[in-house]
């Protein structure tokens, strides 16, 4: 096709599909890290297109911290069943036995043990050598400098000072035994691109992205939704019902909502056109310390 006749979304779609096919042709045991959010929804849709009329030749994998929103878990199970895809759910059982949770142990320790260590356990257990993720360069500064093929050593660590050049659409996938890569087909997409594509392709997403009245408490400058009975309320804290939605989704105690009236996709897109803040501002794990995301990625985080 002539690139000059493609819309920018079709160009992004074509690039992402090319990346999926390249990885499947080069690696023995790929997997898609399915975190249930909007980026995962788009990534899954692109994977279905890339291998149509067949199904993607790799499973989905969700590293479950046990603290995701209930709506996310219900959506995950329903979507995998609808599409007839293999879904691997991995939980760091040692972390569960230790009672690790974000309220008692804080966001950093919770993320390190239940997400990062859980992910490394799963990759080792199933011997995956390539893992697709939905990260985008516009999300956060450490992700802005990460390549589409992000190489990890045998301990799953990332070295930002030792990345391979990527010229045009040429990717070097050679790895040594025990090494692996993380692959980001949405690297060049923006948050607005994602929402426009969801609208144009009619992609199902978790209802939490749409504004609705929900029980929240204001804590550390963020609106935290009271999603289940495990959330301890501080002295004098009373949940309020506010019309909110989420720009990003993670563990519910670590994810801030925003007040919004955007209850449809066109309204969300209009909101995105006017916003001047990053979606990651609603993720407490990004505020642990300066450069916290880069440090997490060096240790094996998504």
Swiss-Prot record:
SUPFAM superfamilies: Adenine nucleotide alpha hydrolases-like (SSF52402). It catalyses: sulfate + ATP + H(+) = adenosine 5'-phosphosulfate + diphosphate. Its EC number is 2.7.7.4. GO terms for molecular function: ATP binding; sulfate adenylyltransferase (ATP) activity. Pathway: Sulfur metabolism; hydrogen sulfide biosynthesis; sulfite from sulfate: step 1/3. Pfam families: PAPS_reduct (PF01507). It is an enzyme of class 2 (transferase). GO terms for biological process: hydrogen sulfide biosynthetic process; sulfate assimilation. Keywords: ATP-binding, Nucleotide-binding, Nucleotidyltransferase, Transferase. The keyword Transcription regulation does not apply. With CysN forms the ATP sulfurylase (ATPS) that catalyzes the adenylation of sulfate producing adenosine 5'-phosphosulfate (APS) and diphosphate, the first enzymatic step in sulfur assimilation pathway. APS synthesis involves the formation of a high-energy phosphoric-sulfuric acid anhydride bond driven by GTP hydrolysis by CysN coupled to ATP hydrolysis by CysD. Belongs to the PAPS reductase family. CysD subfamily. Heterodimer composed of CysD, the smaller subunit, and CysN. HAMAP family: Sulf_adenylyltr_sub2. This is Sulfate adenylyltransferase subunit 2. The lineage of its organism: Bacteria, Pseudomonadati, Pseudomonadota, Gammaproteobacteria, Methylococcales.
């Amino acid at each position: 096709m002539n690139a000059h006749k493609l819309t920018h979304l079709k160009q992004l779609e074509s690039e992402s599909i090319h990346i999926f096919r390249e990885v499947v042709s080069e690696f023995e045991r790929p997997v898609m890290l399915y975190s249930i959010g909007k980026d995962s929804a788009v990534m899954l849709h692109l994977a279905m297109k890339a291998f149509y009329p067949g199904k993607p030749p790799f499973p989905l994998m969700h590293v479950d911290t046990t603290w995701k929103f209930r709506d996310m878990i219900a959506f995950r199970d329903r979507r995998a069943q609808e599409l007839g895809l293999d879904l691997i759910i991995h939980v760091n059982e040692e972390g569960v036995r230790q009672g690790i949770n974000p309220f008692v142990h804080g966001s950093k320790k919770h993320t390190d043990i239940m997400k990062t260590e859980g992910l490394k356990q799963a990759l080792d257990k199933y011997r995956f050598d390539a893992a697709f993720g939905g990260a985008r360069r516009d999300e956060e500064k450490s992700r802005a400098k990460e390549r589409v093929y992000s190489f990890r050593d045998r301990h799953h660590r990332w070295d930002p000072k030792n990345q391979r050049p990527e010229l045009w659409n040429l990717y070097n996938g050679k790895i040594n035994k025990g090494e692996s890569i993380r692959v980001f087909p949405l690297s060049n997409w923006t948050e607005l691109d994602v929402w426009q594509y969801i609208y144009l392709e009619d992609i199902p997403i978790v209802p939490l992205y749409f504004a609705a009245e929900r029980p929240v408490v204001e804590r550390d400058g963020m609106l935290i939704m009271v999603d289940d009975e495990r959330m301890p309320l501080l002295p004098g804290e009373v949940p309020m019902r506010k019309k909110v939605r989420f720009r990003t989704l993670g563990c519910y105690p670590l994810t801030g909502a925003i007040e919004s009236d955007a209850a449809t996709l066109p309204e969300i897109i209009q909101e995105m056109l006017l916003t001047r803040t990053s979606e990651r501002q609603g993720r407490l794990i990004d505020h642990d310390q300066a450069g916290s995301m880069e440090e997490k990625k060096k240790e094996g985080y998504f």
